Amino acid sequence: MSEKIYDVPAEWAKRAFVDDAKYQEMYASSIRDPNGFWAEQAKRVDWIHAPTKIENVSYAPGNISIKWFEDGVLNAAYNCIDRHLATRADQTAIIWEGDDPADSKHITYRQLHDEVCKMANILRNRNVKKGDRVTIYLPMIPEAAYAMLACARIGAIHSVVFAGFSPDSLAQRIKDCDSKVVITADEGLRGGRKVPLKANVDAALNKVDNVDWVVVVKRTGGKIEMNPTRDLWYHEAAEMVTTECPVEHMNAEDALFILYTSGSTGQPKGVLHTTGGYLVYASMTHQYVFDYHEGDVYWCTADVGWVTGHSYILYGPLANGAVTLMFEGVPNYPDNSRFWNVIDKHKVNIFYTAPTAIRALMQGGDGPVTKTSRESLRLLGSVGEPINPEAWEWYHRVVGDNRCPIVDTWWQTETGGILITPLPGATRLKPGSATRPFFGVVPEIVDADGNTLEGATEGNLCLTRSWPGQMRTVYGDHARFEMTYFSTYKGKYFTGDGCRRDADGYYWITGRVDDVINVSGHRMGTAEVESALVAHPKVSEAAVVGYPHDIKGQGIYAYVTLMAGETPSEELRKELVGWVRKEIGPIASPDQIQFSQGLPKTRSGKIMRRILRKIAEDEPGALGDTSTLADPAVVDDLVQHRQNRKEKQA
């Protein structure tokens, strides 16, 4: 834990929306009178019918129900586009920066309106109605924003699938939410390489039969197959429709989107967010956490395939009339200066990225950063996983020239928006700490039995109060919603994260405590990777755990037992890595595979993951009690053949 403290720069305290006194006052008000507080915040969006009911929430076992602003009526796309046309039609809404540094464009709010209406009319003409699901499998191109906002405009529910997922993962997600339409591109571009998106969609649709239409955006012009009865080119369909499309009236509790996240059971969960509460919360957190002022150029480097892209590239910034940058590329293409060149090119003021990217660029040294100016920057942010103090210090010193505060934000797909975070004009910073709760958020640290722990302590992080951005259910499976988040500690939302609170009341996230690994800020269920490995004909059994990784935060460590007669080899190791890439996607590739004669199991057959974690972390002396194992000799073999020895890496 870092002992350093960075005070709020005086000029920040002066110009920010919130200084420390204001934070204390607003936070106290949000806890004392949540209905009054959130009724006031609800005014930041335009309502067709303003809500009179603010919060209606139950965390009671068997009756988990979350409703905010439930009698209000609005439209998210109207709030992100139309309401800005009177005052900023010609202001840039989206700066798009392509994979190729020579490829960029500015899209104004008026242009955004016209393009979204065209996409919405294409969908309406294909009989997409309010409540229908649309799967979006696109690269980071403007059409991804058009597609999401077009769905919001007509009341369809979008399900964005990250374009790095495999055909099998895509098929699973299309089937689970019963999508009528898939919107994709011929190919994606990433780091100079082509990604076969349409071919992946074709492969996925061989496994499902619920899709009527595939809308294809021409990105590269590469050769693809088109099914004449199902597939249509976006650019051709767009020529046949108008740039006007009336907005659907949406109840605040009507669904806005589904976003799949890894679960510990291996079956992805469709996290469902609704319209009113989500939009209010995304807008509010974007304004206060990033201290967004009119005219600022704001860049969140996430992909819209993840929740950070939903809340902090699209909905939050656009609801606030912001200039938001959308980046198709990767941090190290064409070289390690790419992020910093983009900041200089577009005069970016606020920069929000992941610790994984920071750590990877840090390995390339200071040179690629210091040869750029970055003088436009005034605020840095971190998201996706805890940031280690060394990376925090480098980010602050080298990228921010010791002058830009860092907002180290903690939240989840399920929370819709940021929950624990510094506010740049209000919060003294400690490297590695997410610091204090946002307005209305009440964290509680509990022990394994659910007892509340007070003061400076460490345990499991729960939240005792609801907030408007909270997910409402797991799509199609409310019982799973209750089981996953509310059954461990009754009457509380359990985050699945461990947490430490220091003597100053600052929160330090210590990582997942369930069977989910956080790889480069993206959650990956261990069961999902295990299922992929066991599907290989040569694999009898597999167990997957996380271990500390210098770049990714956590790496994937797989223990694999082979079928009788099969022999471990380097070739088979590579084959299994490729197999998992194909089954799930590159993000799930194991970093280490250890072939094992068996796995440590209790006499009842339960795998002792605690032991596997310690071996993967190269801590064989900390295995604890192994007497309950059916065959303790298995552990000796695993320790002897472990892949992640410190001396091996030296």
Curated annotation (Swiss-Prot):
<keyword id="KW-0007">Acetylation</keyword>
<feature type="binding site">
    <location>
        <position position="308"/>
    </location>
    <ligand>
        <name>CoA</name>
    </ligand>
</feature>
<dbReference type="GO" id="GO:0003987">
    <property type="term" value="F:acetate-CoA ligase activity"/>
</dbReference>
<feature type="binding site">
    <location>
        <position position="523"/>
    </location>
    <ligand>
        <name>ATP</name>
    </ligand>
</feature>
<feature type="binding site">
    <location>
        <position position="539"/>
    </location>
    <ligand>
        <name>Mg(2+)</name>
    </ligand>
</feature>
<feature type="binding site">
    <location>
        <begin position="190"/>
        <end position="193"/>
    </location>
    <ligand>
        <name>CoA</name>
    </ligand>
</feature>
<feature type="binding site">
    <location>
        <position position="512"/>
    </location>
    <ligand>
        <name>ATP</name>
    </ligand>
</feature>
<keyword id="KW-0479">Metal-binding</keyword>
<comment type="similarity">
    <text>Belongs to the ATP-dependent AMP-binding enzyme family.</text>
</comment>
<dbReference type="GO" id="GO:0005524">
    <property type="term" value="F:ATP binding"/>
</dbReference>
<dbReference type="GO" id="GO:0005829">
    <property type="term" value="C:cytosol"/>
</dbReference>
<feature type="binding site">
    <location>
        <begin position="384"/>
        <end position="386"/>
    </location>
    <ligand>
        <name>ATP</name>
    </ligand>
</feature>
<dbReference type="Pfam" id="PF00501">
    <property type="entry name" value="AMP-binding"/>
</dbReference>
<keyword id="KW-0547">Nucleotide-binding</keyword>
<dbReference type="InterPro" id="IPR045851">
    <property type="entry name" value="AMP-bd_C_sf"/>
</dbReference>
<feature type="binding site">
    <location>
        <begin position="408"/>
        <end position="413"/>
    </location>
    <ligand>
        <name>ATP</name>
    </ligand>
</feature>
<feature type="binding site">
    <location>
        <position position="534"/>
    </location>
    <ligand>
        <name>Mg(2+)</name>
    </ligand>
</feature>
<keyword id="KW-0460">Magnesium</keyword>
<comment type="function">
    <text>Catalyzes the conversion of acetate into acetyl-CoA (AcCoA), an essential intermediate at the junction of anabolic and catabolic pathways. AcsA undergoes a two-step reaction. In the first half reaction, AcsA combines acetate with ATP to form acetyl-adenylate (AcAMP) intermediate. In the second half reaction, it can then transfer the acetyl group from AcAMP to the sulfhydryl group of CoA, forming the product AcCoA.</text>
</comment>
<dbReference type="GO" id="GO:0016208">
    <property type="term" value="F:AMP binding"/>
</dbReference>
<feature type="binding site">
    <location>
        <position position="332"/>
    </location>
    <ligand>
        <name>CoA</name>
    </ligand>
</feature>
<dbReference type="InterPro" id="IPR000873">
    <property type="entry name" value="AMP-dep_synth/lig_dom"/>
</dbReference>
<dbReference type="InterPro" id="IPR032387">
    <property type="entry name" value="ACAS_N"/>
</dbReference>
<feature type="binding site">
    <location>
        <position position="520"/>
    </location>
    <ligand>
        <name>CoA</name>
    </ligand>
</feature>
<dbReference type="InterPro" id="IPR025110">
    <property type="entry name" value="AMP-bd_C"/>
</dbReference>
<keyword id="KW-0067">ATP-binding</keyword>
<feature type="binding site">
    <location>
        <position position="581"/>
    </location>
    <ligand>
        <name>CoA</name>
    </ligand>
</feature>
<dbReference type="Pfam" id="PF16177">
    <property type="entry name" value="ACAS_N"/>
</dbReference>
<dbReference type="GO" id="GO:0046872">
    <property type="term" value="F:metal ion binding"/>
</dbReference>
<feature type="modified residue" description="N6-acetyllysine">
    <location>
        <position position="606"/>
    </location>
</feature>
<dbReference type="InterPro" id="IPR042099">
    <property type="entry name" value="ANL_N_sf"/>
</dbReference>
<protein>
    <recommendedName>
        <fullName>Acetyl-coenzyme A synthetase</fullName>
        <ecNumber>6.2.1.1</ecNumber>
    </recommendedName>
</protein>
<dbReference type="InterPro" id="IPR011904">
    <property type="entry name" value="Ac_CoA_lig"/>
</dbReference>
<dbReference type="InterPro" id="IPR020845">
    <property type="entry name" value="AMP-binding_CS"/>
</dbReference>
<keyword id="KW-0436">Ligase</keyword>
<feature type="binding site">
    <location>
        <position position="536"/>
    </location>
    <ligand>
        <name>Mg(2+)</name>
    </ligand>
</feature>
<dbReference type="GO" id="GO:0019427">
    <property type="term" value="P:acetyl-CoA biosynthetic process from acetate"/>
</dbReference>
<dbReference type="Pfam" id="PF13193">
    <property type="entry name" value="AMP-binding_C"/>
</dbReference>
<feature type="binding site">
    <location>
        <position position="497"/>
    </location>
    <ligand>
        <name>ATP</name>
    </ligand>
</feature>
